[in-house]
């Protein structure tokens, strides 16, 4: 039965492109040539309108000498260039392009694919270790030889700009002469050998032994010069030949080539479509096509209440579970004879999941109803544990696929987890583009044609909803199941290629004590020491170049069917944002040093241009141009808005407890996080803070026990206190204090609760509220912030005054003991509140007060002996300070293990509670909790979300290994890596 009229339509889809078609007769849909000789594989048929080179393919050594070597020399030379490096690079590349057009022809694809190997669609499955071991075997060296070990650890001593290929060639030079051949290999011959190498790597078992015995690989070793081999190794490893060459080479070839490549992700299409620089692309020339990767539609994270979210989506939307995996698009072609898998960045993962319906961990389970010839699916690839029957955390997807492929190929032990593909969209079906159809239609088509396979291919569907209550219920259910969150999709929205808008909205649980966003930051400064500290920056972009977001009333739908062009915002400069030292291993420190060696400038001798790099008051010993730097993925506990740090970094705020997760080798200065992205993330996080500050101390009680007071004297304790006696007054708290009577630390959050409970206003940012008349600044610790406030003329009151006001239920007069720093006028008024013996006129003298006075000298003496630096060092060890832990342990006979975890937490400043609702984080003691108890905790947390229409903060659930990891690292490590499952 034919469900839809186009299911039996075998007519090929015609793509509208500027004058020249892009589908070639001798090319398969993945862009890999079919058959032919090495030379003929890269010739283009004149009948299909593609460009033809009028001269034979030039030698590969000519490409190396004319382009690669010259650009390398410019990169290595710091002086004596005679002109700026950018200008020299542009001259070299433009001259090469001009020579190619004049002496070879208009088809630059053969050279382009060798110049940009990391953008080549071919996969050789060769890593550093594979190449090193294969070369050692080729040189007939014993296993684990000194040469092999030296090559395997090449990064440790490699200077900047030197790659593994250089060391490999040096070892070859020591053991043999350079090959003497009658004829050099041409560019087409090199491409032909690479085609054969790709074929060999995808047939049967592939290892370093297979590479060493590969006919194609050995042919190149025996017919290439040392210079050619160096670049050949780079091509096989898919590492950049020359940094920044992609943008330069594409732009020199055609003014639209770089923008077009971001959409089609295929060098062959770019080269064969844009060969005439006089023919320019138009906006409507971009569309999804079968077999070619594209940028997917991304969900936006918003900062508004759920009622407004529902209104923004037209009160008609789908709710889907947000999966924690890799965004993968599947291109199903020729009834399953050809299948391709692409990531959101256009990386081809077909080798992991199967190139046709008869092989692979996913492809052989991908089934459709009769009549489906070709289609494009959008979904998420996750890891599924078959024994526990649950989705595993992100990071195991590719390894799960590799293990499954190995099991199906060799029959070895079956892995416990495997990849699962969750499909949620259909974009193309039998020649018909569906991106201009709304979500309702696309889901209807998808449900009709896809046949799910249990635990392998899953149809990710969700209810169609219309109100905020459905959002909270869905988020609560997602949390109860341990999911990452939910995605809301406007029912009438279209699929916007390469766009992030609010027709798709993602909602994640707001976690306590967590900023919640990973940021990719460029290193711009360094302070060398026993442990280097890096100053990282955000990019300031030109707002005029950003895409205008959809208006609140109109949503995000457009009547136009044309696909948008992705415009990268123009970066104006970089401004300092935070300092990073934690989370970077010794190997990563060496890697950063290797990648940036030779590009650092002493700050005192040569300051950076402020129109490109700008620091706050905190300046480094050395700075680096962002274009020559590295990008770090950074995560933080929260945003730090302290007044004292507002000038340290040019952004005006910084990150608290920030640490590095990894070096982002796939990012550079042009793709790092921007100030606009940071502001969006900060506003999204602060929405919860704003809504909760309004009820600070009402809905959440302090976890500490309240003190009971037995007062003697003039104040009648039986008289009820006035609940709003602080109304109209504003309070800014810089620190807590140690209460001598209760022998406990009173932190700033408790003081804030006390302020709000008595009608006062607790402010977080002094900069925007400094002009208030009835403003009290509370603090007693000698911090940088307090020193700055004192220098600016502010009166500082001890926090004990506020707590005594709450204690006695009235606004007390300021006495000398409550003054930390004040003007002479205020001190004169304060002295009038006590007698000549220093006793208060308004407060009673109690037994506790006398004891506190007796112990005061001892406490002050001990603190002075420690010194400010010692106290600060001690506080840095309290990594869990301010955190409240709920310990999950339902096996009584392992109580000693729980006691150890509890002791570790409390020794680092944390506290333990038996009330789950008060917990900042839940720690499941390893091997001491059951799935039943874990699910009960999740259900409790999920019910908390479901029962409220406001954004509710919830604790993360980790294993006790997280506590141990934090103590070992001496900072808060990423909770996601220790999630309890």
From Swiss-Prot:
Binding residues for Mg(2+) 2: 484
Matching InterPro entries: Adenylation_DNA_ligase_IV (IPR044125), BRCT_dom (IPR001357), BRCT_dom_sf (IPR036420), DNA_ligase_ATP-dep (IPR000977), DNA_ligase_ATP-dep_cent (IPR012310), DNA_ligase_ATP-dep_CS (IPR016059), DNA_ligase_ATP-dep_N (IPR012308), DNA_ligase_N_sf (IPR036599)
The keyword Nucleus is annotated on this UniProt entry: yes
Cofactor: Mg(2+)
Superkingdom in the source lineage: Eukaryota
Region (Disordered): 544-563
Reaction catalyzed: ATP + (deoxyribonucleotide)n-3'-hydroxyl + 5'-phospho-(deoxyribonucleotide)m = (deoxyribonucleotide)n+m + AMP + diphosphate
Single Gene Ontology MF annotation: metal ion binding
Protein name: DNA ligase 4
Lineage: Eukaryota, Fungi, Dikarya, Ascomycota, Saccharomycotina
Primary gene name: LIG4
